Amino acid sequence: MNDFSQPVIDSIHKPRDAANPRERYAAGVMKYREMGYWQPDYAPKDTDVIALFRITPQPGVDPEEAAAAVAGESSTATWTVVWTDRLTACDIYRAKAYRVDPVPASNAAEPQYFAYIAYELDLFEEGSVANLTASIIGNVFGFKPLKALRLEDMRIPVAYLKTFQGPPTGIVVERERLDKYGRPLLGATVKPKLGLSGKNYGRVVYEGLRGGLDFLKDDENINSQAFMHWRDRFLFAMEAVNRAQAETGEVKGHYLNVTAGTMEDMYERAEFAKELGSCIVMIDLVIGWTAIQSMARWARRNDMILHLHRAGHSTYTRQRNHGISFRVIAKWLRMAGVDHAHAGTAVGKLEGDPLSVQGYYNVCRESHNEVDLSRGIFFDQPWAGLRKVMPVASGGIHAGQMHQLLDLFGDDAILQFGGGTIGHPAGIQAGAVANRVALEAMVKARNEGRDIVHEGPDILEAAARWCTPLKQALDTWRDVTFNYASTDTPDFAATPTAA
């Protein structure tokens, strides 16, 4: 039995003339670069899908051969020559690795490279993120000649984007429905995330909305458990929404998580949410791309906002050398069609370098992404009219960080203070009041031309003199930070984790 490691391949490999069909398709093993997967003179077409991979070859594996192997294994190749290639337009369908660059400041003992690979558009099914990902992140991520592999960015051609519906609502229409402009939206996740009865759950929702939040939210793992059936949660939560709306005169909402074990159950829950008058439903990333696109189509048909919690993403986005960058996930989510997507906080408890996170937000909400290496964006990306996704900042944030959050993310974002609302020493409603007052004070100061980055703490202290709940929030959390080194910073800009 042959051991198909690089040294053995080198020992049994005989150079062939790839232009000669007799040699090119003779049985046996060829290097991927000689099979046509390395084409340094290739000029990508406007209709090509382009992927940028970070590759870490095994010792002794040439980086160009490694890039060619990634191109081959993510498109048409297998480990040996197959004569059935001659039955296809393989010269067209094979992916082309056309550029390899060393990663700046990578470890000399374990060098990394950026590999640019172009894919013919016909390789992918129209309007299917599942099919796109089956190729781009399929078997190739387990390929032995690579020590590690990470998908850093993609250029999606306009011709392919036009086959996707994108977000069912989008930022502009959502603001019109809510009649809320000129500031970020405010939310909170119900805590504790598990264990509350339906009635107590509804009370938390009411208190948060009554205190000034725009949304309350189910957490990722609250579905339908022994302590609270999903139908009870929906009923009590919507009772709270309706009561808070009547008392405040503002449009309010609660993200009802319809995630379930089957699509039939998810549709049933979504339909019930609609019957109760909810304007929004929620799903988790872990349901998969086909289910996400299915729920996006349902939301579009039913004029509902679709919120996505990115539960599970860090299992493959957090490590810098292997997996997928969240900027790619953000692109796929926009194509799949969600209206909200959790995209990081930079200053909270979860992983996120400030510049990287700003890059994720830009992917979600810009009409055209320009190359911005400092934020990890490698490609010029027009969005072909796809609606914009509202990015969500959630996880370990509090009122004392309001100036940082507003400076980092601007108005088109949702700031979700779960523990920073529910954990307020004077109660849930006081926590909501503190966050609303802090936000409005900071927006007012920004609009007056003040330097909120440097004056932010003073602005909050001034507002707290007239708002006891805000003073209590600042006294409780003012010094709470999560200032740890980021595991995933842009290669072309070193930045600290905390803004």
From Swiss-Prot:
Substrate binds at residues 139, 189, 193, 310, 342, 394. Its EC number is 4.1.1.39. Mg(2+) binds at residues 217, 219-220. InterPro entries: RuBisCO, RuBisCo_large_chain_AS, RuBisCO_lsu_C, RuBisCO_lsu_C_sf, RuBisCO_lsu_fd_N, RuBisCO_lsu_N_sf, RuBisCO_lsuI. Keywords: Calvin cycle, Carbon dioxide fixation, Lyase, Magnesium, Metal-binding, Monooxygenase, Oxidoreductase. It comes from the Bacteria. Its cofactor is Mg(2+). The active site is at 191 (proton acceptor), 309 (proton acceptor). Binds 1 Mg(2+) ion per subunit. One of its GO terms (biological process) is reductive pentose-phosphate cycle. The basic functional RuBisCO is composed of a large chain homodimer in a 'head-to-tail' conformation. In form I RuBisCO this homodimer is arranged in a barrel-like tetramer with the small subunits forming a tetrameric 'cap' on each end of the 'barrel'. Heterohexadecamer of 8 large chains and 8 small chains. RuBisCO catalyzes two reactions: the carboxylation of D-ribulose 1,5-bisphosphate, the primary event in carbon dioxide fixation, as well as the oxidative fragmentation of the pentose substrate. Both reactions occur simultaneously and in competition at the same active site. Belongs to the RuBisCO large chain family. Type I subfamily. PANTHER family: RIBULOSE BISPHOSPHATE CARBOXYLASE (PTHR42704), RIBULOSE BISPHOSPHATE CARBOXYLASE LARGE CHAIN (PTHR42704:SF17). This is Ribulose bisphosphate carboxylase large chain. It comes from Paraburkholderia xenovorans (strain LB400).
